Structure formats: structure tokens, C-alpha cells
């Protein structure tokens, strides 16, 4: 299984001024990554910088110079956290929709094929089914007003009133989408583990996903370990191999023949380095994954 090759392996990078995407791809190259994910603006804010300032052409040229031209549009924009298309309050849902629609258009302008969306929470509704119906309705409306971008609904940890922690709920929404070429799934390993699915049973889990949802809808993997026991419903990411899922289980999953061709994105915690301050371990984690060898001592496991 681990003889399979992972093509798109990357991490979250920040879209910071003044270089925006050019700065992002420089970081990607430095990390040894072959894909990446970013927010097009602050995830907890409605403020946005025009996409014309993101230096997309320079970023594409930089990728080509470093032999990453085949990345093409296989990178990911993550939706801001303020969007909840499942809200039963029509005024709040409409505000979310307008922000969502703008983000979809920005994603297309920034050349990304995939847009990852947290499905939302069942607020101001009688039950989760009503929340799922609201989500499907708004997704269809947005898809009819945009083009190309594939919306990937993220598997959630079942924390609070979250929807789509169960594969069946994702399938319920997908079944209602008119243009199924525009809908997909982002599989978050921490969230799935925290929702009660067992990543130690790789083949069984993949088969179950395929039977309920269909592997053809799986486009993006968020690769995270978990600080919590399976089924905790808490959503606390851990660095790869330093959590309750474990290095070997995560490797067995991502090197599986049905998974290794997906876009795999690290979203793991940063560490507090006494010299460098707060820094990510993405470069080290990518090396561990490529080398298929766990490195101890990178994280203070008491933290």
C-alpha cells in the first residue's frame, strides 16, 4: 500500500500582504510541498483585498520555475468561518449566502479548482434535516450563479450543532444538488476520528465512504492527527503522529490507492519554538510523510 505515490501533498499557507499568492508559493516550495490551501481573507472577517492584488501570474511563473507547473489549478481555497448556509434564520442565512457567493467568485478569479466549506450548524431549525435542506438549497442557488469551482463539503467532528459529521448527511445533501460536477467532499481525518470513525480500519472505512457517498466525490483530504479519543466530538487537531490516530494509521490511509491521488493538506498545530517563536511543522511533517518515517521530539507531547 505504501508503495503508492502521493502527488499533491501540501499545507495551509497564509495570504499575507504584499505578495499574497507569490509569497504563498514561495513558502510551498520551501516546505517541499506540491499543493496548498489558503483563505482569501481573514477567516473571521468580512474584509477582503481585491483578487487583482494577489499576484497570481507571478505565483504561477514561480511554480513553473520550480518544476511545479503541473500543479495547475489543483490547490484549495478554504471558506471563512462566518458562513452558515444551514441557519434557519433567513436574514442571517442570506448574509452568509452573499458572502459565500463572493468567496466562490474570488476562488475562481484566483485560479483554484476547489473551495472547502464547513457545512454549518443546525441553528434556528426544528431538526438537522431542515438544516441540511437549507444548505442544499443555498448550494444549488450559488452553483447556478457561478462557474467551474468545485465546492467540497468538509466532514465535521459532530461538535455542538454541527451538521455533516455523518457520511449519510453528506450524501443527503449531495443527492439534492442539481449539478453534481460542482459538489464534492473534503475528508478531515481529525474530524472523522472525533466523530467516531476508525482510521485504524483503513479499508473498511474507505469502503464505507464509497458505499455511502462515493469516492468519485472525494477531492480533498485534510490531514490531521487528533488530541482526542475516537468519538470525542471535540475537534482538536494534533501534529502527525503525536495524537490518538497515530502515524501508521494516517500513512496507511493517505497511501491507499484510492486516496493517494487526492489533494492532501496538512492543518496541524504550530509549535512554540524558544528561538523562532510560534512556527509550523509543515516542512518536517511533509518530510516524515515522504520518508514514511516518524520523527520523535518535534512536539512537546504534554502541551
Swiss-Prot record:
Enzyme nomenclature, EC number: 3.1.21.2
Binding note for cofactor: Binds 3 Zn(2+) ions.
InterPro entries: AP_endonuc_2, AP_endonuc_F2_Zn_BS, Xyl_isomerase-like_sf, Xyl_isomerase-like_TIM-brl
One of the record's GO molecular function terms: DNA-(apurinic or apyrimidinic site) endonuclease activity
Cofactor: Zn(2+)
Residues that hold Zn(2+) 2 according to the record: 154, 188, 222, 267
Assigned keywords, A-Z: DNA damage, DNA repair, Endonuclease, Hydrolase, Metal-binding, Nuclease, Zinc
DNA damage as UniProt keyword: yes
Any one Gene Ontology BP term: base-excision repair
Residues at which Zn(2+) 3 binds: 191, 235, 237
SMART domains for this protein: AP2Ec
Catalysed reactions, semicolon-separated: Endonucleolytic cleavage to 5'-phosphooligonucleotide end-products
Binding site for Zn(2+) 1: 78, 118, 154
Classification via PANTHER family: APURINIC-APYRIMIDINIC ENDONUCLEASE, ENDONUCLEASE IV ENDODEOXYRIBONUCLEASE IV
Family affiliation: Belongs to the AP endonuclease 2 family.
Purpose of the protein: Endonuclease IV plays a role in DNA repair. It cleaves phosphodiester bonds at apurinic or apyrimidinic (AP) sites, generating a 3'-hydroxyl group and a 5'-terminal sugar phosphate.
The name this protein goes by in its record: Probable endonuclease 4
Upper lineage: Bacteria, Bacillati, Mycoplasmatota, Mycoplasmoidales, Mycoplasmoidaceae
Amino acid at each position: 500500500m505504501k508503495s503508492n505515490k502521493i502527488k499533491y501533498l501540501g499545507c495551509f499557507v497564509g495570504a499575507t500582504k504584499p505578495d499574497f499568492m507569490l509569497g504563498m508559493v514561495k513558502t510551498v516550495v520551501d516546505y517541499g510541498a506540491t499543493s496548498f490551501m489558503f483563505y482569501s481573507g481573514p477567516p473571521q472577517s468580512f474584509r477582503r483585498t481585491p483578487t487583482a492584488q494577489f499576484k497570481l501570474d507571478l505565483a504561477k511563473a514561480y511554480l513553473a520555475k520550480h518544476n511545479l507547473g503541473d500543479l495547475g489549478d489543483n490547490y484549495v481555497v478554504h471558506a471563512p468561518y462566518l458562513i452558515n448556509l444551514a441557519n434557519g434564520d433567513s436574514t442571517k442565512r442570506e448574509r452568509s449566502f452573499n458572502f459565500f457567493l463572493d468567496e466562490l467568485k474570488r476562488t475562481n478569479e484566483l485560479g483554484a479548482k476547489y473551495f472547502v466549506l464547513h457545512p454549518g450548524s443546525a441553528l434556528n431549525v426544528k431538526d438537522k434535516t431542515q438544516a441540511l435542506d437549507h444548505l442544499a438549497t443555498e448550494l444549488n442557488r450559488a452553483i447556478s450563479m457561478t462557474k467551474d469551482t468545485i465546492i467540497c463539503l468538509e466532514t465535521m467532528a459532530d461538535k455542538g450543532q454541527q451538521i455533516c459529521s455523518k457520511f449519510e448527511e453528506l450524501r443527503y445533501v449531495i443527492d439534492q444538488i442539481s449539478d453534481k460536477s460542482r459538489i464534492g467532499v473534503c475528508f478531515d481525518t481529525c474530524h472523522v476520528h472525533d466523530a467516531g470513525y476508525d482510521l485504524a480500519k483503513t479499508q473498511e472505512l474507505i469502503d464505507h465512504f464509497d458505499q455511502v457517498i462515493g469516492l468519485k466525490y472525494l477531492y480533498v483530504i485534510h490531514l490531521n492527527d487528533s488530541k482526542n479519543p475516537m468519538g470525542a466530538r471535540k475537534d482538536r487537531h494534533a501534529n502527525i503522529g503525536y495524537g490518538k490516530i497515530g502515524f501508521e494509521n494516517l500513512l496507511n490511509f493517505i497511501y491507499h490507492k484510492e486516496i493517494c491521488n487526492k489533494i492532501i493538506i496538512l492543518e496541524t498545530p504550530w509549535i512554540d519554538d524558544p528561538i523562532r517563536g510560534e512556527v509550523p511543522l509543515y516542512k518536517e511533517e511533509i518530510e516524515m510523510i515522504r520518508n514514511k518515517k516518524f520523527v520523535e521530539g518535534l512536539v512537546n507531547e504534554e502541551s
